[in-house]
């Protein structure tokens, strides 16, 4: 969880990007602080009924990213045709008002609170002492919540995880085909992975291409023994290793891992007719508001509410 000073510094960074790189500071202010709130004024439920009980869908959020989380999740329901049980992971900073908004728009969602996770899932955590201990030591790191909480919170056969800075624009055929087959292949977005472990040991070069913005796997392809070994190798004095533990950890422990097509699930470049989803990572976060939500709003399901 971020301290207030860190949040202010981060937002100032985005303002500078909007002003000097994108030359759209006033548009950024409008779309982020005024326009983006309109999604919360809808009277319609945004979720769709679960039609695949073998699938769990996970998204982690916090107070700072709350509006972004709403747009990301609404775009998921608009783009997908297969809907699993939704798990919304609260890092502990969501206000009661924000929790009520989640219940209003996503009434069947299961809300997982990081502050009570150790008690709520005590029996499961006790089965994995290494998970339990590293999670407790580094509770403030988002990465351990993402890889541990999502695995333990649900028992569904398949797990889809995506970040709040992902927007979905078209039906993800590649992902849904795997879901229909039971996920014999694990999928992650393609890009850069942090490459080094303790003492400079380098991860297999073949696996450095993955990004954790989008992850799909079958539980049977999640190797807990490999993940335990990975956690035990982490240099816990290196904040960068801790920050990327979910990304590198998934790369290490998922069997039959493949990358999603880079030209369809993009991180860089503008959205075009081939783009299925875009990951608006921190260096390009202002574009979430300057580009992404405008594309999403062109969809009837978002602009008028899910039917």
What is each of the regions a protein language model found here?
Residues 2-125, 281-307:
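N-terminal anchoring/stem segment of glycosyltransferases
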Residues 71, 75, 101, 149, ...:
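Amphipathic alpha-helical segments that form well-ordered structural scaffolds
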Residues 87-89, 111-113, 160-163, 168, ...:
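A structural signal for short, well-ordered beta-strand segments and their strand-loop junctions
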Residues 104-153:
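Active-site-proximal specificity loops/subdomain of glycosyltransferases
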Residues 115-124, 194, 266-271:
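A short acidic, often aromatic-flanked loop/helix-cap motif at beta-alpha or helix-coil junctions
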Residues 142, 146-191:
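GT-A fold catalytic core of metal-dependent nucleotide-sugar glycosyltransferases
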Residues 184-204:
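Short beta-strand-to-loop element that shapes/binds the nucleotide-sugar donor at the catalytic cleft/hinge
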Residues 191-193, 207-287:
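Catalytic core and acceptor-binding pocket of nucleotide-sugar-dependent glycosyltransferases
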